[in-house]
UniProtKB/Swiss-Prot annotation:
Coiled coil: none annotated. Belongs to the universal ribosomal protein uL2 family. The gene is rplB. This is Large ribosomal subunit protein uL2. GO terms for molecular function: rRNA binding; structural constituent of ribosome; transferase activity. SMART domains: Ribosomal_L2 (SM01383), Ribosomal_L2_C (SM01382).
Amino acid sequence: MAIRSFRPYTPGTRTRVVTDFSEVTGRKPERSLVVSKHRRKGRNNRGVITCRHRGGGHKRQYRVVDFRRNKHGVPAKVAAIHYDPHRNARLALLFYTDGEKRYILAPAGVTVGQTVISGPDAPIEDGNAMPLSSVPLGSSVHCVELYAGRGGQMVRTAGASAQVMAKEGDYVALKLPSTEVRLVRRECYATLGEVGNSEIRNTSLGKAGRRRWLGRRPQVRGSVMNPCDHPHGGGEGRAPIGRSGPVTPWGKPALGLKTRKRNKPSNKFVLRKRRKTSKRSRGGRDS
């Protein structure tokens, strides 16, 4: 997989950088694993906007992804690598020996024709799923369960991986992509290797229209709104915000405010908090 840039023959292609999709082998998704999905466009059940800047975009069909990997001891062959419009990672289509078909997140380096398997006795190879108790120290894993049997909930984005740091008692210490070190039960499953399509962080949309295709609407600055719409609004011309720091449309501090509850029960499983990162250091398709 590589990235592709374009000659500046239009303003939209001058800064456009995309992945070349060379690893994608399947043209159409598996019909038995595709379901329709109602797009809420940032609204809740009452029609009230709860997430701004959402709406429009190209129609999508949801691919049912197997995050549990609960077919233990049954080998599966990678039949194809498919594109998924709902995530940056690619999907690997698995054909199990008993005839069942499933999608999983495509790990980096896994190719068509390769065999993967899940279970406590699975070999140490990328793409195989096993309990954290069976993963060697220092190994990279992704699609990690927080609770046994619930399915992978952490480390699922393109290019992400967590590192197994230590094992003690019933818990395994994982270093997450955010640099946070967290304890997870040793019976929780994880997939070896990192998620593929890591080059997505080096891409650039190039124009506003491509962002609209993804279902992202324009973000209007609060300083150009009226005072009834945003605390930064109002004034004559380009007026300052008139506060000690920027705030959200609801008047709460916008930058650096901790949103995690201080007395959250799972705080005892966090051995080391993540380091602070700036917005400029974050990459990805939406940058």
